[in-house]
Amino acid sequence: KEKYASNPDVDTSRSNRNFHFVTPQRSYRAEAEKQIAEAGCRTRSDSVRVVEALVTASPEFFKGKKRAEIKEYFIYALDFIKEHQAEKTIISAVVHMDEKTPHMHLCFVPLTEDGRLSAKDIVGNRKKLTWWQDEFWKHMVKKYPELERGESASETGREHIPPRLYKEAVHLNSLRDKIMELLSGTNPLNARSRAAEIEKL
């Protein structure tokens, strides 16, 4: 199993199983700038040009499901996004099958119905994010009643962190646990070999 150094969860031998619903025609930045120019929007240096959403479910939900069933799940999820965001603004929708749990990365240009560039109006604050999550769950549970609503950030008080940082934290915790396990079993007879194992980590 070959792994990316930046993302140890990726199994490159399964990357050919990934699939697109929306394939980017150019770089995200270039596509966003094109749509923004066509809409006649003015931008600032700190304007959000692309919003990324991550769509998934628990590993248990996907367990035993065939590729066609997984694809159907994400098509239904994409339908929800299209109900609330103009389809032409969706510049990429790709399902990753090469990690532990199938998930879809979806990117769109945050253009409002009246042609403004405003991620704040679309995604907004924590309250608006909670609304998106609630409405998404209501949509999905119509077809998949076994799905449970995840904990809302507005209830837990936890801050959202990007997937990359979350994965790095999980990886570091895993390394810490391995090191502690090796150290706990270290004695004068195996100290050198244990030190070598820790260095390899």
Question: Where are these predicted regions, by residue range?
Answer:
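N-terminal nicking endonuclease/strand-transfer module with a His-rich metal-binding environment
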Residues: 1-201
